[in-house]
Amino acid sequence: MFAVIKTGGRQYRVVPDDVLEIGKIAGDVGTIVQLGEVLVLGADTPVLGVPTVAGASVAAEVLDHKRGPKVISFKKRRRKNSKRKRGYRDEITVLRITEILADGNAPSIGPRVRKAKPAAEAAE
């Protein structure tokens, strides 16, 4: 089963266990967030939303918050000794899709438990 979700003005095709980077959303690392704007639910017979599928959502675990690559905006006006250089980095949230929910169900899968490293490996 797949879903097409919309977040941050962009659309993503997702299946369970996908890892994707989207624009920053609220949520602490390790928590489950629900993305409610589902445009398409796909299975044997796909369900198209008008504009969204009623009662459908996608549950995802927040893996990380980070910054994207630097984007440089450079403008030069030739023969005028004039230029402008600016750069920025987007705030990014890394998500793992845990499950696709239909009919207003609540997420049944919680966040994954991280395995603790043994003391010998942590010292190295």
UniProtKB/Swiss-Prot annotation:
Pfam families registered for this protein in UniProt: Ribosomal_L21p (PF00829)
User: Is-annotated flag, keyword Metal-binding?
Assistant: no
Q: Which Gene Ontology cellular component terms are annotated?
A: cytoplasm; ribonucleoprotein complex; ribosome
Which residues does UniProt assign to the signal peptide? none
The domain of life for this entry's organism is Bacteria
- Annotated segments matching region Disordered: 105-124
GO MF terms held by the record: rRNA binding; structural constituent of ribosome
Name a single GO biological process. Answer: translation
Quote the HAMAP family the UniProt record gives: Ribosomal_bL21
Assembly behavior: Part of the 50S ribosomal subunit. Contacts protein L20.
Q: What does this protein do?
A: This protein binds to 23S rRNA in the presence of protein L20.
Q: What is this protein called?
A: Large ribosomal subunit protein bL21
Q: Which organism is it from?
A: Rhodopseudomonas palustris (strain BisA53)
